[in-house]
């Protein structure tokens, strides 16, 4: 039998300082503040950020009052845009709000006398995906892309002396070589990292300002040495920390790879000053990095009555629990809804030929409806989606994150709430029982 050729697959991630992610984080911060005061809030909040300004737009139905100015500015400052030289600064940027009341036509289809029969907030299809690339059941290229940027941000926030030139904006990309027969990762093929930075003079050229160095050595020489220093730090600080954070089996894949660091040669102008940021423009980064499928609906700024968000989380939960239970090695789940209708109009499953015990995809899809209650109200209750839990989802992915509980203030009371509940594996026993798996 002829062995299939190995193949390459690539995914990217962006940092919390990427302009589109700044917009996502602003939208989810505002959503959280509405839910903190009024868990029944209906919110659809879009954000736009550019040089020196933020505009917040959308529809809201809530009893809460949210200080938009304070929420936006604190989010921007937390990310790290707190210097005038960035041309986008949480302390001085303009903040405009164009939030208005939600359409009564939409609201009457969502809210029902019987809360359990709450209708879907819109029509559409949502996808969930899981595979065995990583212990979190996520595709390896996206997992590594997220992790590299989380480590980079951690250095910038907590150990700035290690790479003191770092600015908030960054992008990463990992290309993974896969075995053509088993479809398992073989090695890391290529890493791309573009990280925004100050204009600085490396120690190799002496102690002086950038302007003085350019005058003495010429700009080409100074910029070359500057990028050489950044690359050296990536190779000796960042990549070793990445490998140390990985399980041993995965860390062994990170060797003899191609590395591109700031391949344009310079990345000083960035963030919302370099590119306009909009909510919902990084939906592939937010989900599976191009693996599986995507229904097109963004997440950030949307309360859980919007099935774009809540049903996508439910689909991920189902796919992950199916793979963890041993139903298949890879699984894609599609849920589809009609606006104002509680139950999904369809459930679709694709296991890419990896289903166990002769199970058919149609049979798996049928059983999903028996195991999981996919009405929006039940999804919301199961994952605690009326709590202010969305801020952490708005950077470094909504899927594949470690679930945890934390005390938060809701309606003036401290309570313990679940974050990333859709990543729990608490339905594995029920799935095994339903499919007769030991």
What are these regions (language model features)?
Residues 12-14, 18-23, 118-135, 268-293, ...:
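Conserved phosphate/anionic-ligand binding catalytic regions in large, soluble enzymes, centered on
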Residues 50, 330, 338-438:
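Internal helix-turn-beta structural module
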Residues 10, 70, 77-202, 219, ...:
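Glycine-rich, mobile lid/loop segments that gate access to catalytic sites or pores
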Residues 16-35, 130-153, 302-326:
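Alpha-helical support elements that line or immediately flank enzyme active sites
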Residues 43-62, 339-343:
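Short, charge-patterned binding micro-sites
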Residues 227-325:
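Glycine-rich anion/phosphate-binding loop at the beta-strand->alpha-helix junction
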Residues 41-45, 170-176, 257-261, 327-338:
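A short glycine-rich, hydrophobically flanked beta-strand micro-motif that places a catalytic Asp/Glu
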Residues 1-44, 428, 434:
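N-terminal, positively charged regions that mediate nucleic acid binding
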């Amino acid at each position: 039998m002829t062995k299939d050729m190995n193949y390459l697959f690539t995914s990217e991630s962006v940092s919390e300082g990427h302009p589109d992610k700044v917009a996502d984080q602003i939208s989810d911060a505002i959503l959280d503040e509405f839910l903190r005061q009024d868990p029944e809030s209906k919110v659809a909040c879009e954000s736009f950020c550019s040089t020196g300004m933020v505009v917040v737009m959308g529809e809201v139905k809530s009893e809460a009052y949210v200080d938009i100015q304070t929420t936006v500015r604190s989010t921007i400052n937390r990310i790290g845009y707190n210097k005038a030289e960035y041309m986008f600064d949480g302390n001085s940027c303009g903040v405009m709000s164009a939030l208005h009341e939600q359409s009564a036509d939409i609201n009457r289809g969502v809210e029902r006398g019987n809360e359990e029969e709450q209708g879907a907030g819109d029509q559409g299809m949502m996808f969930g995906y899981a595979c065995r690339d990583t212990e979190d059941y996520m595709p390896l290229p996206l997992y590594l892309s997220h992790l590299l940027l989380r480590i980079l941000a951690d250095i910038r926030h907590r150990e700035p002396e290690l790479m003191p030139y770092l600015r908030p904006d960054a992008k990463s990309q990992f290309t993974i070589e896969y075995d053509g027969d088993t479809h398992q990762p073989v090695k890391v093929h290529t890493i791309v990292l573009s990280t925004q930075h100050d204009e600085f003079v490396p120690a190799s050229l002496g102690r002086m300002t950038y302007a003085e160095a350019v005058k003495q050595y010429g700009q080409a020489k100074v910029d070359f040495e500057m990028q050489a220093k950044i690359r050296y730090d990536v190779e000796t600080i960042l990549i070793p920390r990445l490998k140390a954070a990985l399980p041993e089996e995965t860390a062994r894949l990170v060797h003899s790879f191609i590395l591109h660091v700031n391949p344009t040669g310079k990345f000083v102008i960035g963030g919302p000053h370099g590119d306009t940021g909009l909510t919902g423009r990084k939906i592939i980064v937010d989900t599976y990095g191009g693996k599986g499928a995507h229904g097109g609906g963004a997440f950030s700024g949307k309360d859980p009555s919007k099935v774009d968000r809540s049903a996508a989380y439910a689909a991920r939960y189902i796919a992950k629990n199916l793979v963890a239970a041993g139903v298949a090695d890879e699984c894609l789940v599609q849920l589809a809804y009609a606006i104002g209708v509680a139950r999904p109009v369809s459930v679709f499953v694709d296991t890419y030929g990896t289903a166990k015990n002769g199970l058919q995809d149609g049979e798996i899809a049928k059983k999903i409806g028996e195991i999981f209650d996919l009405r929006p109200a039940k999804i919301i209750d199961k994952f605690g989606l009326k709590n202010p839990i969305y801020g952490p989802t708005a950077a470094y992915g909504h899927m594949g994150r470690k679930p945890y509980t934390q005390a938060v203030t809701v309606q003036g009371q401290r309570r313990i709430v679940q974050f990333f509940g859709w990543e729990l594996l608490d339905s594995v026993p029920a799935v095994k029982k339903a499919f007769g798996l030991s």
